[in-house]
């Protein structure tokens, strides 16, 4: 298999895997619709997912990486739909509007700033890539609290093994793809994603679940690589 064909195959499988990962939010929204309430859950993961995918979409357009563009068009659309569903069923609509307004402001400010660098395309790509990495790393910081809880309780039953394993595979695929196309902005966040997933998988070995269910795991605790 040629290098070009291998790159194409890897990017295609990575896109498919990532979209399936994004679709995990649909199960949560389904519960909102069934209960006609969001309960005490937060809409921040959906809103931040929209922000992350929007930035990566911008990066994909600037670098002409079609796989990045495709997966983040799908991702930003899904997270926007999830946010709208959350808004419909939450009692705290004002907070949701404020959070989404803040995210939109950040998005617009970054786009306007990078557009001013149009004559310096490499710098435009560099700045956008840094922003993408920062946003993604912030996602990866979210599960750390749950990891500390598992370590204190010495019980990993609150962690969903299938979702964590999927996250590892997705991050690994994008990491390899980033290496193949020599893109450090794709490599760095997905390397961190692999490490985080391995840490969580390691907790299953160190602290086996006493009665595994995984129901306590919330979307906020799952990082989104793209």
From Swiss-Prot:
Keywords: Cell membrane, Golgi apparatus, Membrane, Repeat, Sugar transport, Transmembrane, Transmembrane helix, Transport
Subcellular location: Golgi apparatus membrane; Cell membrane
Gene this chain is encoded by: slv
Main location: Golgi
MtN3/slv domain boundaries: 9-93, 128-210
Role, per record: Mediates both low-affinity uptake and efflux of sugar across the membrane.
Membrane topology, record value: Multi-pass membrane protein
Protein's name according to its UniProt entry: Sugar transporter SWEET1
Species of origin: Drosophila melanogaster (Fruit fly)
Gene Ontology MF terms: sugar transmembrane transporter activity
Entry GO CC: Golgi membrane; membrane; plasma membrane
Family that this chain belongs to: Belongs to the SWEET sugar transporter family.
Gene3D superfamilies linked to this entry: 1.20.1280.290
Keyword Cell membrane: yes
Residues spanning the membrane: 9-29, 43-63, 68-88, 95-115, 130-150, 161-181, 185-205
Coiled coil regions, renumbered to chain: none
Classification via InterPro entries: SWEET, SWEET_rpt
GO BP of this protein: carbohydrate transport; salivary gland development
């Amino acid at each position: 298999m040629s290098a070009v064909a291998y790159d194409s195959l890897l990017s295609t499988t990575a896109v498919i895997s990532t979209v399936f990962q994004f679709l995990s939010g649909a199960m949560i929204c389904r519960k909102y619709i069934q209960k006609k309430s969001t309960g005490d859950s937060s809409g921040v993961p959906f809103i931040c997912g929209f922000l992350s995918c929007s930035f990566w979409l911008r990066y994909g357009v600037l670098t002409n990486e079609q796989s990045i563009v495709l997966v983040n068009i799908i991702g930003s659309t899904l997270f926007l739909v999830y946010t709208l569903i959350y808004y419909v069923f939450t009692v705290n609509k004002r907070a949701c509007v404020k959070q989404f307004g803040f995210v939109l402001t950040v998005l617009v400010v970054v786009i306007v700033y990078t557009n001013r660098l149009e004559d310096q395309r490499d710098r435009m790509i560099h700045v956008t890539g840094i922003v993408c990495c920062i946003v993604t790393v912030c996602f990866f910081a979210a599960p750390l609290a749950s990891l500390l809880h598992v370590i204190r309780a010495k019980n990993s039953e609150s962690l969903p093994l299938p979702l964590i394993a999927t996250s590892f595979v997705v991050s690994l695929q994008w990491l390899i793809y980033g290496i193949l196309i020599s893109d450090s902005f794709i490599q760095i966040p997905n390397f961190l994603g692999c490490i985080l997933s391995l840490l969580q998988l390691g907790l299953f070995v160190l602290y086996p679940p006493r009665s595994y269910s995984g129901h306590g795991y919330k979307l906020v605790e799952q990082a989104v690589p793209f």
